[in-house]
From Swiss-Prot:
Protein name in UniProt: Shikimate dehydrogenase (NADP(+))
Subunit details: Homodimer.
Binding, NADP(+): G135, A136, G137, G138, A139, V236, G260
Pathway: Metabolic intermediate biosynthesis; chorismate biosynthesis; chorismate from D-erythrose 4-phosphate and phosphoenolpyruvate: step 4/7
């Protein structure tokens, strides 16, 4: 990559914490190199406390765009000049574009489309399905909304009663009023309702981040009876490649156990297009990422 850097190189960033596990820098930098684009992608350890300064830095330094991950996807919105209609519906942002590098920051969301495409690539069609989703943060909200837009029969959201719960109530209202999908929200502490919902669902999606460091020894599902041969289990975490949830699902005979690598790839491809105006070489990047994960 050093051979590509020059005084004209445009910088793209990632602001999140924790950050060291992220494959986004590799994905984007390899794509830039493959296409001969004079861009570089760097990750910065940024939480909510540093977020305002980080956004000001994007403006001041002329950084052309940034991906945004936990815990900043909702917190960043007040610092932006504009958000896309999809981001407004979701109430979260995972991609920021600095229009012409002049400091006008526009927020977008690509998580939901990335997740649905990742499922489709695994042969899983969400249309007319009952889906249980745990987690109502930025990623979970984006997925829930996209499931509604793409025709799921029901989306049953479970989340602990934290700051995200009130936002999830608004998300449920939006899905019910703007799509044909029936959405509901339940406290994750109600384990009987949680298990019953999964028993009635064909797809279970965990968007909580449980299973990623430092919670790699945890899983929201610990009862083998919850796992069925016709149940698809999808965890948005991709590092580790096999979370405790996915290992448990495989051991107890789930139809499919899918990690978040595909979601990361496809949401990244959409962000890449927003940053550069070019199509990411998805097949090339997919081979690189999946081969690395298999080592």
């Amino acid at each position: 990559m050093s051979e590509r850097l020059s005084g004209h190189t445009l910088l793209i960033s990632l602001i999140a914490t924790p950050i060291r596990h992220s494959l986004s820098p590799k994905m984007h930098n390899e794509a830039f190199a493959k296409l001969g684009l004079d861009y570089a992608y760097l990750a910065f350890e940024v939480g909510n406390e540093e977020l305002a300064d980080a956004v000001q830095g994007i403006r001041a330094l002329g950084i052309r765009g940034s991906n945004v991950s936990m815990p900043n996807k909702q917190a960043i919105i007040p610092y932006l000049d504009e958000i896309s209609p999809a981001a407004e519906l979701v109430g979260a942002v995972n991609t920021v574009v600095n229009k012409d590098g002049k400091g006008h920051l526009v927020g977008h969301v690509t998580d939901g489309t990335g997740a649905v495409r990742a499922l489709a690539e695994e042969g899983v069609d969400i249309k007319d399905q009952i889906i249980t989703l745990s987690g109502a943060g930025g990623a979970g909200t984006a997925i829930a909304v996209q499931l509604g837009l793409d025709g799921a029969k029901e989306v049953r959201i479970f989340n602990q009663k934290d700051a995200a719960f009130a936002n999830a109530e608004k998300t449920v209202e939006k899905i019910n009023s703007r799509t044909q999908t029936k959405a509901s929200l339940t406290d994750l502490a109600d384990q009987e309702a949680f298990k019953k919902s999964i028993a009635e669902s064909s797809i279970y999606i965990d968007a909580t981040g449980v299973g990623m460091k430092p919670l790699e020894d945890m899983s929201l599902i610990t009862d083998p009876e919850v796992i069925r041969p016709d149940l698809v289990v999808f965890d948005v975490v991709y590092s580790p490649a096999e979370t405790k949830l996915l290992k448990f699902a495989k051991e107890h005979g789930a139809k499919k156990a899918i990690n978040g690598l595909g979601m990361m790839l496809y949401q990244g491809a959409e962000a890449f297009k927003l940053f550069t105006g070019e199509d990411m070489p998805v097949d090339y990047i997919k081979d690189l990422l999946f081969n690395d994960q298999d080592k």
